[in-house]
């Protein structure tokens, strides 16, 4: 099995995802002629790349959904032995400038979360990378109450950005979404709005889903 062509429809994508559930990273990598790194210190995106390759993801840019022709975003989610998420989930970069007129309905966060294929993966560090397993896929769309909670957080956080209150933003704001610096290092600056409306240099910020929210998604699936 080499890199696959993009799935033509949702059922085909889900079938592919189910077919790799239960495999170890080593088994899946061997099928795809990929080499498993010893760890993720230098290859942070390797697991995502492995799953994307196996499923035939197409997004050349992070701005698009991974399966944009199907309207589906792909997210791997590292979990512990109890199935609880081990980390927050990156959604998209926040628009720190040129953001007038942006609404929840036209936002990148809503676009990215409109339909998500979650792939839980074993993430505990004591398990060697090659021996970690791929989990059962979950195809998810936010319920009306989940979307309402996402929207409330997004609107509150965007108010901070638009009103030039970047220095007041902390990871504690938001019930299900949070804003955190997103960049390889503190030298990777971008343009934002200062408190007097001036353009300033600032750290890029990303929207992240809190672990409690993704845990709820996984729990709801298991209860079905």
Curated annotation (Swiss-Prot):
Cell location: Cytoplasm
Pfam families: MutH
Gene3D superfamilies: DNA mismatch repair MutH/Restriction endonuclease, type II
InterPro entries with a match to the protein in the record: DNA_mismatch_repair_MutH (IPR004230), DNA_rep_MutH/RE_typeII_Sau3AI (IPR011337), DNA_rep_MutH/T2_RE_sf (IPR037057), Restrct_endonuc-II-like (IPR011335)
Source species, domain of life: Bacteria
Keyword Phosphoprotein belongs to the record: no
Protein name, entry field: DNA mismatch repair protein MutH
Gene: mutH
